[in-house]
A protein has these predicted regions:
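Membrane-interface extramembranous regions at the lipid-water interface
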Residues: 1-98, 109-155, 161-165, 180-184, ...
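Membrane-interface segments at the starts/ends of alpha-helical transmembrane spans
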Residues: 100-107, 143, 175-196
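Transmembrane alpha-helical segments of integral membrane proteins
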Residues: 163-174
């Protein structure tokens, strides 16, 4: 390995580490802001810090292989979404203080949507990244799990959009009305969040960590 590529790999590892910790931290902070008082006492700082970690991570990744057009294009899209999330993050705190304010609630919904888009796009970034790495097993695993993640998120969005569309209709068959009532229960919403968010986030974190290990192994050798 040439010494010239070592600084580039350092930025890559730093970016992957920031993404690995930033994903669950952002999700946890945004949820806690809605239900707990402790993070609210810190004001806007927690969601700004966690979304800032994601933005920092993507910016660090962009310093690896800047000549690869497909890789950089995928990163630019992820960076744009990370920047939007960073800009909208303070509204999580504002909404937690004034939950009845419709404007804040709509901004938080927009943040949830762009956050999901970021997760979607970052899975595409991982596909581009592992295509440049020499580990065939990692490429196969990433190809399978990112496709599964993307299909899961798209299906969840379609399902959620379908429920909202049906809820707006005036006349529906009794069976559909009963299904909508079940879907609106707290338990059903929790299950939807688990499928739509927690599963893709956990699998993405696993892929990020495996990719980081492969990069470190290429520099220092495999772990004993």
């Amino acid at each position: 390995m040439t010494p010239d590529i070592l600084p580039s790999l350092r930025h890559l590892v730093r970016g992957l580490t920031a993404i690995f910790w930033g994903l669950p931290a952002t999700l946890l902070i945004c949820v806690l802001m809605a239900v707990a008082e402790l993070p609210r006492a810190l004001g806007c700082a927690p969601p700004i810090i966690t979304t800032g970690m994601l933005l920092f991570g993507v910016c660090e990744l962009a310093r690896f292989q800047p000549q690869e057009r497909a890789w950089q294009t995928a990163l630019e899209r992820a960076k744009l979404l990370a920047l939007v999330n960073f800009g909208l993050a303070p509204f999580v705190y504002f909404w937690s203080r004034l939950p009845s304010e419709t404007y804040y609630f709509q901004i938080v919904l927009a943040l949830a949507f762009t956050g999901l888009l970021f997760l979607y796009q970052f899975n595409l970034v991982l596909q581009r990244l592992v295509a440049m790495l020499p580990d065939e097993t990692l490429r196969a695993d990433t190809r399978f799990f990112t496709r599964f993640n993307l299909a899961l998120m798209v299906a969840g969005l379609v399902l959620m959009g379908g429920f909202h569309l049906l809820a707006e209709l005036k006349s529906l068959p009794p069976a559909v009305i009963e299904l909508l009532e079940v879907a609106q229960t707290a338990r059903s919403r929790f299950a939807l969040v688990v499928v739509l968010v927690l599963v893709p986030v956990s699998m993405t974190m696993s892929l990020v960590w495996k990719t980081r290990d492969v990069v470190l192994g290429s520099v220092f050798g495999p772990r004993s």
